[in-house]
A protein has these predicted regions:
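Conserved beta-strand signature within the Rossmann-like core of class I S-adenosyl-L-methionine
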Residues: 154-162
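A short glycine-rich, Lys/Arg-flanked "PGG" loop and its adjoining helix->strand segment in the class I
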Residues: 141-153
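Conserved alpha-helix/loop element of class I SAM-dependent methyltransferases that forms part
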Residues: 41-61, 71-75
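Class I SAM-dependent methyltransferase SAM/SAH-binding core
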Residues: 63-117
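A short acidic, Gly/Pro-enriched loop at the edge of an enzyme's catalytic core
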Residues: 116-128
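A short SAM/SAH-binding and catalytic strip from SAM-dependent methyltransferases
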Residues: 126-139
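Core SAM-dependent methyltransferase catalytic element
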Residues: 203, 208-230
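Short alpha-helix
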Residues: 186-202
Length: 230
């Protein structure tokens, strides 16, 4: 019963309330409502569970794309990680992440930059981590090409992302909401073909798990979780 009520209310907000507020008062929505919506979603139990599955696999010199306010920091294993470069275009979120980094004995260098132009040398990173980030990067393909460039020849990409469902009905919804959903979600696109983007960047996916997140709308909760080699 709780799940049904949640889905009804969340759909009400996604399809009616948020769009009305966003298109009538953009500044208020993006400053007062959107940040708390994103933070709440990123902190939800199903999302945190996915982070916990993949982040501990990181090793050596790590690049985290879209580090945001540092939701992943508590899942890194300090004994396996020598340094983390956290890339995010938001100064405000980087400041929040800095406060968290000191709690977990991690050496983190926060870089305010877009993922499409990573200011790091070629072949300098052991592990790249992306979690629920590619959906909101304007040019995800360019970002993945950049990740490929900075990874060492033995480097690994670790990812957990949501994207295009293989189910036609769900995919039709994902494609159908493109005209408004990115505008109310901070640029998130629900219909990105994550495996295709990764392989187009010349990565070899060696492990891939797919699923629908429990207690979430299927059109926002189809998950691609795995690893890829350079």
């Amino acid at each position: 019963m709780k799940k049904i009520i949640y889905l009804i209310l969340s759909n009400l907000f996604i399809f009616i309330i948020y769009p009305i507020i966003r298109f009538t008062n953009k500044k208020f929505y993006e400053k007062k409502i959107l940040p708390s919506v994103i933070n709440s979603t990123c902190n939800s139990r199903p999302i945190q569970y996915q982070r916990k599955k993949v982040v501990p696999k990181a090793f050596g010199i790590v690049l985290e794309i879209g580090i945001g306010s540092g939701h992943n920091l508590k899942y890194y294993e300090p004994s396996k990680v020598t340094k983390i470069y956290g890339v995010d275009p938001s100064n405000e979120l980087n400041k929040l992440a800095k406060d968290k980094a000191s709690k977990y004995s991690l050496d983190v260098d926060f870089i305010v930059s877009s993922a499409e132009e990573i200011p790091l040398d070629d072949n300098s990173i052991d592990t790249a981590v992306t979690t629920f980030t590619l959906c909101s990067i304007p040019d995800s393909q360019k970002a993945l090409n950049e990740i490929y460039r900075v990874l060492k020849p033995s480097g690994k990409l670790i990812f957990s992302e949501h994207g295009l469902s293989p189910d036609k009905f769900v995919a039709n919804i994902q494609n159908g909401i493109e005209f408004f959903y990115p505008k109310i979600s901070g640029g998130c696109h629900a219909n990105k073909d994550i495996p295709n983007l990764i392989t187009n960047a010349k990565f070899n996916i060696d492990n891939l798990e797919t699923m629908y997140l429990p207690s979430r709308q299927k059109f926002l909760g189809y998950i691609f979780c795995g690893t890829a080699n350079k």
